[in-house]
């Protein structure tokens, strides 16, 4: 990886006509702006379908794409919808906030209209055949789930819950149209994303995607393959994932995701993981692995506990996992999310893997000094962020942190006062100027937005994953400023360097 930079902007945060960011013309325009700004990467969040809580890290499938991201204008061009039909539904009226309730009640209705006009062809048939290993279970799962009012598979009758063949065959016959509807959604999603991804690559922009380490309990993955997880004889979790208590939370974090049966995964040579990562490498150019330390050891909380207090660290697969993956798939473009407290064994695993870890500027300013997140301490093989989707915006963070931290930050930046209208750019400057090979800046920091633009507050429910960039905010002035800073710190793509020397 050459010295470069990029922007973090979730697909759902793009501006668009229909309530949520999608694979619309605005996505293509954003790619063009990244190219003009001298960027090399567009980092996004997981693309999977979301449910209660709207988190892309709690998806109904590790393979499926979010149908909300299907561009309706493209379906109009294909003759599957009319513009009038698109305007008949209420997708929400706020340009800067996603109204998921309105999206849920409108998007599937309009997609159903498109599905009713859709005619299967050879391309569609090939897609269904090539993706049958996950698409068949996912479409059946969602169709059954809908028929039962949206409840999770563990609440279904035993015959379906335990996947008895007669019950599955009856469901396939009774729900044939609903199953086909979900296959249609995935076909359109994959077609549109593939076109956008190809366009981005053609403009010199690579996509950084995201693999959540865990899957949701309410998912096609757990229902179809319970042997992959730590379940009892009745397919209930024995233990679930989370984080132990720390200075930020006296009771820790109870994520609730099922834990992997690593013994089974090792016995099968991590075959499920290899298929999953291979699929991700079709969607993305670089993959960020969430919660990297979970492969060294994972925090196990007894199922049914209300807090994470009584959990314990258990050994994960370690480098055996990554050696096996590399043996099967070759050298991988992976970024390791290694934030938080790291043991010596995690650091050894990161070093052995050769993957770049993450550095976050907001974490740097412990008034005691010596933080590994201070830019002068970064290794070259790392990816620096001003903040991530789980942090406040830099402007929001600065105003909410304590005086000692603010004073240290100002001293480090070598200023007595930070300009309110420009605050985030001082921290972008620190990230860009660092030795870290790759610098990724969240869009909210490029726009110097406050805490109202925060994407997620971990361990909270409601109000997350809703921020959208308003149309026109990422304007020519900001694009030009980003380009100049990218040039200044020698992060421009090679083909752009020669043509810009005289200008600057």
Map each language-model feature to its residues.
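Short alpha-helical segments and helix-capping/turn motifs at coil-helix boundaries
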Residues: 25-32, 126, 191-199, 273-275, ...
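Conserved, well-ordered alpha-helix/loop/beta-strand core segments that scaffold catalytic motifs
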Residues: 182, 186-215
